[in-house]
Amino acid sequence: MPIIESALGVEKAFEIATASQNVVAMAIGLEDYTADLGVSRTKDAKESLYARTRIVNACKAAGIQPIDSVFSDVADEEGLRINVKNSKELGFEGMGCIHPRQIAPIHESFAPEKSEIEKAQKIINAFKEAEEKGLGVVSLGTKMIDAPVVKRAQTTVKLAIELGLIEKDWYLVSSHQ
């Protein structure tokens, strides 16, 4: 797994991500990256926003997993959780750890919440029902459901299954309730 730690690495992120079929994930190392820029890391992370979004975009375009940098303050669990939330919102699918006490909060924060899973299941079910009826357009509540929304819902459900949060055959159970 390559770790991008320089301005040049950020600019060549897609090239690195696609350099070999063995590359399945790519991370950013923000301590080295910010040192390369000659700036300090800050809590609001403005100094690394470009690099982080560039890494996520390169990874997604290459079909690999983007991994965010470690959170250096091992005593600040609340700060870690906020950082992980921000990482997830940017599109990262994981984060490095520098201390064992960071593992559980990171896993919990990247796992989909119950409400996210339930919403994703409703979207998938509504889309399947519409397909079965031959409808090209479907809505759930006041929101239109299109292919990107369904894809995002499928990703959420797949992760929930992989983490053991729901059963693999959830759709059989939920459609008969």
Regions found by a protein language model. Give the residues of each.
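Expand to "…catalyze enediolate/carbanion chemistry for C-C bond making/breaking, isomerization
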Residues: 1-177
